[in-house]
């Protein structure tokens, strides 16, 4: 009798599992059909278009709400325009709460659900779009298997460390090609605001410069840019920030010292664009009686960069060991979000300008390019290098009207030029333009709004 009871119990458990699988498959079918019904999508184009016929796994990493899904929707629109049927599009967003309990074993149900919907369509003719798939543990094993066995048209997006280039190179074993996504560029910002950026009349130029001033202090997150009400924009930004704080940091890494983490983030925000000593911040936090270890702060700094809240660059040096020992400079993912978290300060204009320049460089530098900063007797904000070759030196300043500032910026970039043997020098300002010739070298000075278009 005991054996019979055990057997019956196993049968009941198996029945429940099968019912759960059937229910999950039905949900997957519903999600697939819902996304197909939305095609074509009503979206505003971005500067960088994803390839439609790439024989690799296209990965789209980026911070939350920066437009990763929109880029995939634009690809789908292009595919449909090229004659691909809607039924050949398989889109799944794994941030749907009904999929939160999915495991890597359940991912095969995605293929089963699609096959049951369209048994006549070969998987090799399907274009698969997996949004936020990194929420499923070991997702990469499924993606690589599908790519090698069934389909070579796969697009995946995500907003945490698992979508970083270093992770992708290892995880996808050379099958992936990366297209990082950021909040809107200045050109995209103008497009979203219906502001012309080419063939400008005098009135257009005035409007463009005003748009730049707004862009430098406001948010570049797409949804926020399109929102007209200031109060709603602020609520959206607070919501984005809290999602990063709690979902990407506190929950993911089991951080219990939330108040200390908030303070640490604000310290990095305040020290924007300057070399930052984690050790100095640690001593400050400890002096206030807050309990945290130095190792915690170093880990938190890593986590903040992994979730794309911050971007950090190292000091230029030819020694990899020295590079790791030097202080990093931290930049924030969005000026408007920083303004929403901190009280805006009038002297922040230069910081915000340099922050936007760094973001623009990240959008436009090649995969093999590296961005560092120069610090010797004097300083230069950005050194753009590829392997051992220094491509460009960039200095950023709000204005060069002041004689002391002018000399500091020029002398800093000249010292960097001598140290790196690079004569391609650029100074980016708020609204000044000229060409400086000194020491038989030429330094171009250009307004940020013009440089970014």
Model-derived regions: residue spans:
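Conserved lysine of the Walker
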Residues: 68
């Amino acid at each position: 009798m005991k054996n019979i009871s055990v057997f019956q119990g196993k049968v009941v458990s198996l029945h429940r599992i099968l019912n759960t699988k059937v229910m999950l498959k039905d949900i997957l079918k519903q999600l697939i059909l819902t996304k197909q019904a939305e095609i074509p999508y009503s979206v505003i184009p971005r500067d960088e278009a994803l390839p439609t016929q790439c024989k690799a796994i296209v990965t789209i990493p980026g911070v939350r709400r920066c437009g990763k899904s929109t880029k995939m929707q634009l690809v789908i629109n292009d595919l449909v325009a090229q004659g691909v049927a809607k039924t050949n599009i398989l889109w799944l967003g794994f941030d749907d709460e009904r999929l939160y309990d999915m495991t890597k074993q359940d991912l095969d149900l995605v293929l089963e659900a699609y096959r049951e919907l369209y048994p006549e369509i070969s998987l090799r003719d399907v274009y698969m779009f997996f949004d936020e798939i990194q929420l499923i543990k070991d997702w990469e094993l499924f993606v690589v298997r599908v790519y090698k066995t069934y389909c070579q048209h796969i697009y995946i997006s995500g907003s945490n460390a698992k979508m970083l280039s270093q992770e992708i190179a290892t995880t996808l074993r050379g099958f992936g090609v990366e297209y990082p996504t950021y909040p809107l560029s200045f050109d995209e910002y103008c497009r979203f605001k219906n502001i012309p950026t080419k063939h400008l009349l005098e009135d257009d130029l005035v409007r463009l410069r005003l748009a730049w001033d707004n862009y430098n202090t406001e948010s570049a997150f797409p949804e926020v840019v399109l929102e007209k009400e200031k109060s709603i924009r602020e609520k959206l930004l607070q919501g984005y920030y809290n999602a990063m704080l709690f979902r990407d940091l506190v929950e993911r890494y089991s951080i219990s010292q939330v108040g200390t983490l908030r303070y640490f983030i604000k310290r990095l925000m305040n020290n924007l664009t300057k070399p930052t000593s984690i050790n100095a911040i640690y001593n400050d936090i400890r002096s206030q009686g807050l309990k945290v270890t130095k190792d915690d702060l170093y880990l938190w700094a890593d986590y903040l960069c992994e979730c794309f809240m911050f971007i950090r660059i190292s000091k230029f040096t030819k020694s990899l060991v020295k590079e790791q020992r030097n202080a990093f400079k931290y930049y924030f993912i969005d000026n408007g979000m920083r303004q929403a978290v901190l009280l805006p300060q009038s002297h922040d204009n230069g910081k915000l300008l340099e922050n936007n320049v760094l973001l623009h460089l990240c959008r436009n530098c090649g995969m093999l390019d590296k961005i560092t900063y120069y610090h010797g007797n004097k300083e230069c904000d950005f050194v753009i290098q590829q392997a051992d070759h220094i491509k460009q030196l960039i200095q950023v300043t709000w204005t060069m009207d002041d004689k002391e500032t002018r000399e500091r910026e020029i002398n800093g970039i000249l010292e960097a030029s001598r140290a790196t043997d690079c004569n391609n020098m650029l100074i980016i300002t708020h609204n000044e333009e000229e060409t400086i010739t000194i020491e038989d070298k030429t330094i171009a000075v250009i307004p940020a709004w013009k440089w970014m278009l």
